[in-house]
Design a protein with these regions (language model features):
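Short, internal active-site loops enriched in acidic
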Residues: 56-57, 227-230, 274-278
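Substrate-binding groove of N-acetylhexosamine-processing glycoside hydrolases
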Residues: 150, 202-203, 210, 214, ...
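Bacterial N-terminal signal peptides that target proteins for export
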Residues: 1-7
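Acidic, contiguous N-terminal accessory segments
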Residues: 8-72, 77-80, 88-99
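Short, solvent-exposed loop/turn elements at domain surfaces
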Residues: 31, 60, 120, 324, ...
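Structural motif
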Residues: 24-30, 53-57, 75-77, 112-116, ...
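Feature activates predominantly on carbohydrate-active enzymes
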Residues: 35-38, 68-243, 262, 266, ...
Length: 652
């Protein structure tokens, strides 16, 4: 076999020399140039490297590193392989004559890329991705940057409600094509803006995705049909043909997109995500098809799987809900037989404090990556969505607490069986140095369980915006949001008993003990780390502790209210429990001003600029606490009168 090799000479220096650096004499691809710059910035003068681009098929999407006579030789099957090597030098810098070999276990690793101070090349180096999802159509410059990094670029179409794409354009089209107007079901989050039975609707959708794909000449399009669904038409034609049902509407919409993109040679990735569990949002019912029960997922998507082009990719969240932390695993992933599937992770600050709180998801990522690998296989893919969730300016790669989540995803997406201890050690050493790293890693590992307890009591749900719910009814909807309500453990956790009140409180107390240990470990490590890093970590762990104190009172009071309701249905009440709710109210009133209390000039590693320049959008816990107290008072007074809450008696 003839191997075609192009040599990129970045210097012939001993790795131990203290002068010189990585210099560039001849480069044939910008990805190699970017990799050289990253190596220089990360390894400085202590490296000499020769890059070799090889066309060997067995090195198509990976790299290898060897070292002889003090010179590193990095071999890659494609130019992006050099970026992958530059993103994790801690894994190969001590290599000898026996090469360090890195091969990707998934054919595709998709990354969502938006506004960032870091370039596409830097993100590719950090995540090991080989495809990028842009916002909307992206720009020509962004697509060019992706191609310069030797990765594919995908446009993104959000939802299938034409009114949300552009109300004026939609109304004008419907005025010209009145038969395309749908019949709305009423009081539904999913709308019937256009009629899927009408040919003019199909033409509109084909034109939309065609324009999106060609605007910046992306390589393909990622589409998601929710949160804004506009094809839920209930007209006579749709009822007769069955196109008034979600499964049929999804299948026909995917078909339109395929018909538009195939002649252009563009690829299609369809996200199967919906909106958590079915629930009321204000006065509208969110159907969230596919999540109401264990067998509904395939019933919703099976028709689209079967009818789709074999080249269409289906991308499914590893979570069986649109929330974190620690939701149950997807019921749909691995069931699109004969189709390529991607597993998706959203490490976007949802329900973990919008990335302000320290919130590891490393253990969950490891468990789900290993499970997903068996379901999607080597020809499948993985996808990563990062961010602060409605908080602009968040830089996931710079966050000294939560960048470990991106780092772990990268390591696990290249080796699902990677040792989690090694991931933590390597990340903490990079960020904090060897002396402080071990203690900081031990501290931040505890945040995964602590944040889960603070936001998701007894494994039940929380709002995807991390906010405190404003009412009892909304909070109880959200308790079911992770879809455990139909599982035995979920039903048991929701039971209105004193035992469950005790379980909620005990879970919070254990988490508070974990945050105390986090604080102790960071204080012990502080003398060996940068003072600003120590200050930021101690502040953010303190925020988490205060959040736990408040959530202990809120969730304890809510479960007490549920107990009082159940007692009321039996014709009795327990005034002592109301007294406990009153004490919870005092705790929330006292501690709520301390939530996210900070020096306005403090700089945050994850968010650009001073913390005081940002609004931490978690809202106040007081409205929910007032509503709990008010409902509990009504229940007690029904049996014991206005003074009954104070006399400490149990009324029959």
């Amino acid at each position: 076999m003839i191997f075609h090799r192009i040599f990129f000479l970045f210097c012939v220096l001993s790795a131990g020399l203290a002068s010189g650096g990585v210099s560039l004499s001849d480069v044939a691809h910008p990805a190699a140039t970017a990799a050289a710059q990253l190596l220089q910035s990360r390894l400085g003068d202590a490296v000499g490297a020769r890059f070799v681009l090889s066309s060997r098929a067995d090195a198509a999407d990976g790299y290898s590193v060897s070292r002889a006579d003090g010179v590193y030789v990095i071999t890659a099957g494609r130019p992006r392989g050099f970026l992958y090597a530059a993103g994790e030098p801690e894994l190969w810098r001590d290599v000898g004559a026996t090469p360090f070999v890195r091969k990707a276990p998934f054919k595709t690793r998709l990354l969502m890329y938006g506004k960032s101070v870091h370039s596409v090349a830097e993100w590719i180096a950090a995540t090991g991705a080989n495809a990028v999802q842009l916002s909307g159509s992206g720009t020509s410059e962004q697509v060019a940057a992706c191609h310069a990094a030797d990765v594919e670029a995908y446009a993104f179409l959000y939802g299938c409600d034409p009114m949300k794409w552009g109300a004026s354009a939609c109304e004008a089209y419907l005025a010209a094509h009145p038969t395309a107007r749908g019949v709305d079901p009423g009081r539904s989050w999913e709308k019937g803006v256009m009629c899927p039975s009408d040919p003019a609707t199909a033409a509109f959708f084909r034109a939309k995705i065609r324009a999106l794909a060609t605007a910046a000449n992306a390589d393909g399009v990622v589409v998601t049909l929710w949160d804004t669904f506009g094809l839920y038409c209930q007209c006579t034609r749709c009822k007769k043909s069955g196109l008034n049902q979600f499964a049929a509407e999804i299948a026909v919409c995917v078909k339109w997109f395929e018909e538009a993109l195939k002649p252009l040679g563009k690829k299609l990735i369809v996200r199967t995500w919906s909106s958590g569990a079915p629930h009321f949002l204000r006065d509208e019912w969110v159907h969230a098809p596919g999540y109401a029960s264990a067998d509904e997922a395939i019933a919703t998507w099976g028709q689209a799987f079967a009818a789709s082009d074999p080249k269409t990719v289906f991308q499914t969240k590893v979570y069986n809900a649109d929330c974190q932390p620690n939701p149950p695993f997807s019921l749909l992933l691995g069931r699109a037989k004969g189709r390529t599937e991607f597993a998706e992770w959203q490490i976007a600050g949802q329900t973990v404090g919008l990335q302000w709180l320290p919130a590891s998801v490393v253990d969950h990522t490891a468990a789900t990556m290993r499970r997903a690998a068996k379901l999607v296989g080597a020809d499948g893919g993985v996808a990563l969505y990062t961010g602060g969730y409605n908080c602009s300016g968040y830089e996931a790669l710079d966050d000294i607490a939560n960048s470990v989540n991106v780092y772990a995803w990268r390591r696990l997406s290249w080796n699902p069986d990677e040792d989690v201890d090694a991931i933590w050690r390597d990340w903490a050493t990079k960020v904090y140095g060897a002396k402080a790293g071990a203690k900081v890693a031990a501290a931040l590992r505890l945040s995964e369980r602590a944040t889960a307890a603070s936001f998701s009591p007894l494994g039940l749900g929380a709002p995807t915006e991390s906010r405190f719910a404003g009412s009892v009814s909304r909070r109880e909807d959200l308790l079911r949001y992770t879809n455990r309500q139909y599982l035995p453990e979920g039903k048991a956790a929701l039971a209105p008993t004193r035992e469950n009140v005790a379980r909620v409180v005990a879970e919070k107390d254990a988490a508070l003990a974990q945050t105390d240990e986090m604080l102790r470990l960071v204080k012990d490590a502080a003398p060996q780390m940068d003072a600003a890093q120590a200050q930021e970590l101690l502040l953010r762990i303190g925020w988490l502790r205060t959040h736990l104190v408040v959530s202990r009172a809120l969730d304890g009071a809510l479960w007490r209210l549920r107990y009082l309701r159940a007692e009321g249905q039996l014709g009795r009440t327990d005034e002592k429990v109301f007294g406990e709710i009153e004490r919870d109210f005092e705790t929330v009133r006292r501690e709520s001003p301390n939530l996210f209390k900070h020096d306005a000039d403090l700089k945050s590693s994850g968010y650009c600029g001073a913390v005081g320049d940002r609004e931490i959008l978690l809202r106040s816990p007081l409205p929910l606490m007032r509503d709990i107290e008010s409902e509990a008072r009504k229940v007690v007074e029904r049996f014991a009168g206005p003074a009954g809450a104070k006399n400490g008696k149990i009324s029959p």
